[in-house]
Amino acid sequence: MTLTLIEEVKETAIDYLKDNECMNTYGCDLHNEIFNTDYFCCYTSDCKKYLEEYGVFEAVEKVQEYEKFNFGEVTTDLSDPFKLLNMLVYILGEEFLNNSNTLTNTYWNEYIPENEYKTIIEELQEV
């Protein structure tokens, strides 16, 4: 793998935004559309490589903290590399998208106008 997991998460989000500028989406739904409608990685061997590169214990800790805070309990099977990695990507994607002030402050509860996708992309590329 040439890109780090975090770089690939960023690239996934930015590519999605570029490819879907004409889509009517609420800002608050964008994270779900990008990171929860398809799997980031499907093969267990690839999932293991990503987790080793990121740090398995760091991934477990991040997922546990996120799920306990947001759901009150841990529901992801932390022994399954596929489930662990895809939940980690979901969390990293949320953290990354939160770097866009336009997305989180202006269009969170509104449809994102087509011309604002470029602004969001520019903000995210600076991260």
Where are these regions (language model features)?
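Acidic, low-complexity, intrinsically disordered interaction modules
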Residues: C22-I121
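Short acidic DE-rich linear segments
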Residues: L124-V127
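Short, extreme N-terminal segment that most often corresponds to the first beta-strand
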Residues: M1-Y26
